[in-house]
Amino acid sequence: MMHAGDVPLEPVPEVGGDPAPAGRDRQPLPCPSDWTFELIETYHAEIARVARDFGLDTYPVQLEVITAEQMIDAYASVGMPVNYRHWSFGKQFIATEKHYRRGQMGLAYEIVINSDPCIAYLMEENTMTMQALVIAHACYGHNSFFKGNYLFRMWTDAESIIDYLVYARNYVTECEELHGIEAVEALLDSCHALMSQGVDRYRRSQKPSLAEEEVRRKDREAYLQQQVNDLWRTLPKGSDKQVEKSSRRFPPEPEENLLYFIEKHAPLLEPWQREVVRIVRKVAQYFYPQRQTQVMNEGWATFWHYTLLNTLYDEGRLTDGFMIEFLRSHTNVVCQLPVGHPGYSGVNPYALGFAMFSDLKRICENPTLEDRQWFPDLAGSDWRSTLHHAMRNYRDESFIGQFLSPRLMREMRLFSIVDDAAELELEVVAIHDEAGYRRVREALARQHDLSEREPNIQVWNVAVRGDRSLTLRHSRQHDRPLSDDVREVLKHVSRLWGFKVQLESVDSHGKVVQRWEAEPAPH
């Protein structure tokens, strides 16, 4: 648990009146290196006041102060305050701790959880300046994004996630006691290997409470087992029409959510195993929006911590020393290393997101002729409503495709290359000029499209009347083959399915160009 040294703060009382007048005529807040609980509450109240003035809509905030070791523990358990046990979390903890102790990596200043109330963890090693930065960044930046963005509204339920994780931990622990740690661990291994293929991309998720989840689980166990028995029962001989009807492909349409299909239709899974598959699937679904909004989420949080703290400084509430430390940290976060630098690892999502939201504000307040040509509806509009509209209604791919401006492409010196396997050299196909703006923007948007980064694998067919084998089909994107670990992943699929699994890789014409098979290991 990561609750030692908790500082649960009461909701900040409403502060009436207009925003504080401009000008540094107010007494600045004390800014010692060491923080106190009272100072955290004071800074939090000031930041909350300014956030309300800007119209940020957030969940209630709960702050908890934790040690570096507890922060490492939070890393290992994907940032959740409660989780089921699995060896991979311990492995991640040991690796992170080792790198941290050797000075090979630093730790995040905070971890924030998309829940209601929104829980933010502050490291006790932080200075008071860094604690204030974390509060502005996490509690009002990320928090408002979690509450407002359409993907989070569609796919996550902040009110019930903690309850569901408590239920998941208790259920997995109960399964370990009844069926053995090794059996549960092997099942979780296979489910974790398929998490990225275990999400719904188009259907609306359900929002049951903890009590409803318990009742539904018992109903599911009885119903699903009956359905599976009906599906796999030995069928009597029938007429030719009946045989033809039953030999149609199952499922009738390809199924993208592999864990969902296994949960509902795997022939040999016991009810408790189906429930564990469901738990992993629900956790994967919870994190699905975050994988599509990293640039927007981090950019939004960085824009608002910068705006909120600068507003407090302009009001005279922050000292020069505070701002120097804050700006040093902020600059490091939004630093974009150039191509060719030893530390370059691609486009920094913090840098790109912060630059885009800042540029949107500039387009609204001080548009150039070029801005008016590219963004006629945005130029001269109210920047707050424009930024909130962008935050609420886009994900990384569409956000970049819609709002990346020529000016920002020039400032970041963006260009697009093509890496053709048939050619010996890379080709620069577009740069930041009149001829290349749209191609660069489209290329960067595609780079943040999940369908471009993750393989498209769907359930294609089940031999219901034959050997019960499962056939998966991979549709190649830009003729890219699957990675070398495909056989290992297939072993996990066959373990869950219980029978032979085949994977076909097809090209853009539907022709099978590669095929793999895996059989479940004998018990």
Where are these regions (language model features)?
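Auxiliary, metal-adjacent structural segments of Zn-dependent hydrolase domains
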Residues: H3, V7-L9, P13, P21-G23, ...
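Fold-level signature of zinc-dependent metallopeptidase catalytic domains
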Residues: P32-I40, L122-E125, M154-D163, E244-R248, ...
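N-terminal accessory alpha/beta regions
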Residues: N83, W87-N114, L165-Y223
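Non-catalytic terminal regions of proteins
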Residues: C118, E125, T129, F145, ...
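Short pre-active-site segment immediately N-terminal to the catalytic Zn-binding motif
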Residues: C118-V134, P289-T293
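Active-site His/Glu-centered metal-binding helix of metallohydrolases
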Residues: I135-S144, W300
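Post-HExxH zinc-binding segment in Zn-dependent metallohydrolases
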Residues: F145-P208, E298, T302-G316, R328-V339
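Long, internal scaffold/assembly segments composed of regular secondary structure
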Residues: S246-S345, P349-Y350, F354
